Design a protein with these regions (language model features):
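Radical SAM enzyme [4Fe-4S]-AdoMet core and its adjacent flexible, acidic
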Residues: 1-114, 122-127, 131, 139
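Flexible mid-to-C-terminal extensions adjoining Fe-S/redox cofactors in radical SAM and related proteins
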Residues: 126, 130-200
Length: 200
C-alpha cells in the first residue's frame, strides 16, 4: 500500500491472484531481488506464501538501469546468488529467465537470454534485452533477421554467460551500461560501444 500510495492495493493484488487461479490460469508473483533484499525475511515469506497457495514466483534481479542507473551496489553478489539458488531448490516454484524450466532438480542454468529476448521500443529500436539499453537496429529501417544476426555477432551476446549480463555481470555493467543518459529511449548504439574485435 505504501509503495502504490493507495489503500488496499495489497489486498486487491492478492485477491486478483485468487481470481486468476480460479479461472484456471497459473498465477505468478513477481519480485525484484538485489543485494539490498536477497537475505531479507520478507523475500522468503513471499516465496513461502507463493508455494503454500500453489503460485509461481518470477524473480528478476535488480538491474542498475533506468532510475537505478549507476547504482551498482544493488547488484547481487556471489553470496546472494548462492542464496537465491538455495531458495530455488527449497521452494521449487521460483522461476527465472536464466534458469532451465524443465530441470526437476532446480539446479540447471540456461544462461543470459540477450538477443534471444529482444525489446522493441515504440520507436522501432531493437534492444538486446529489456534491461540492457543497447540498440542493435531498428525494425522500421531494416529486417528483424538482419538485426538479430548482427546482435549474435557481438561477442558478449554470442558467447554463453551463466550470469545475467544486465543484473549480475559487473564487468559488463560498468563497461557498457553506464553511458550518460543511457535509457530505453536513448539506448547506446552497439556499433559505437563495441570494438571491431568484439563484433565478428
Amino acid at each position: 500500500d505504501e509503495i502504490r500510495g493507495r489503500k488496499e492495493s495489497w489486498k486487491r493484488a492478492i485477491e486478483g491472484l485468487k481470481h486468476v487461479q480460479n479461472a484456471g490460469m497459473d498465477p505468478y508473483l513477481n519480485i525484484t531481488v538485489g543485494h539490498y533484499n536477497a537475505f531479507n525475511s520478507d523475500f522468503e515469506e513471499l516465496l513461502k506464501y507463493s508455494k503454500d497457495n500453489k503460485y509461481k514466483t518470477l524473480l528478476n534481479v535488480a538491474v542498475p538501469s533506468g532510475m537505478w542507473q549507476k547504482m551498482e551496489e544493488i547488484v547481487c553478489d556471489e553470496k546472494d546468488r548462492k542464496h537465491i539458488q538455495n531458495l530455488r531448490k527449497k521452494y521449487g516454484n521460483l522461476v527465472r529467465n536464466l534458469w532451465n524450466p524443465f530441470d526437476r532438480n532446480n539446479e540447471k542454468i540456461l544462461g543470459c537470454t540477450t538477443v534471444n529476448r529482444l525489446y522493441i521500443t515504440p520507436l522501432g529500436d531493437v534492444l538486446v534485452c529489456p534491461y540492457v539499453h543497447i540498440k542493435i537496429g531498428n525494425i522500421l529501417k531494416q529486417p528483424l533477421k538482419e538485426i538479430v544476426d548482427f546482435g549474435f555477432r557481438i561477442k558478449y551476446f554470442k558467447e554463453h554467460s551463466s550470469l545475467c549480463l544486465a543484473g549480475e555481470d559487473t564487468n559488463f555493467i560498468s563497461k557498457f551500461m553506464t553511458k550518460e543518459k543511457q535509457s530505453i529511449f536513448n539506448p547506446a548504439l552497439a556499433k559505437d560501444i563495441f570494438s571491431k574485435e568484439e563484433i565478428s
